[in-house]
Amino acid sequence: MAKSIRSKWKRKMRAEKRKKNAPKELARLKNVLAKGSEVLMDDVKEIATVVPSKKINEKTDMDVDAPEGDSSKMDMELKRNKKNLRDQHGQYPVWLNQRQQKKLKSQCGKKKGKSKQAKKLAW
């Protein structure tokens, strides 16, 4: 779509306004951050301990390398029917939405029995 003259003019004026107000905005941001950092850090220190991100990353790396016996065991306990995705208690998985559940129910409801023989023509 073509850009109108009006929209070009508005865009140009907004850019000029940003240039004009940039120093004020920067000073205001610095002021807010200076005040906010003192107050927030004091509050956070009272509530919780501050831990550097490097330690947290190292900790998660160790957890990933460690064998996961409990979680894999739980996955094995749940036996799902591959055809209709139900588990042993008849529950659908959490990620399956209602529409898909309804569709699966209708597909499983149709039983494939012996097909009836077509009537033969009498000659």
UniProtKB/Swiss-Prot annotation:
GO terms for biological process: dendrite extension; positive regulation of dendritic spine development. One of its GO terms (molecular function) is basal RNA polymerase II transcription machinery binding. GO terms for cellular component: chromosome; nucleolus. The keyword Nucleus applies. Residues 1-23, 55-123 are annotated as: Disordered. It is found in: Nucleus, Nucleolus; Chromosome. Residues 70-89 have a biased composition (Basic and acidic residues). Residues 1-21, 100-123 have a biased composition (Basic residues). Keywords: Chromosome, Nucleus. Its main location: nucleus. Regulates dendritic and spine growth and synaptic transmission. Belongs to the learning-associated protein family. PANTHER family: PROTEIN LLP HOMOLOG. This is Protein LLP homolog.
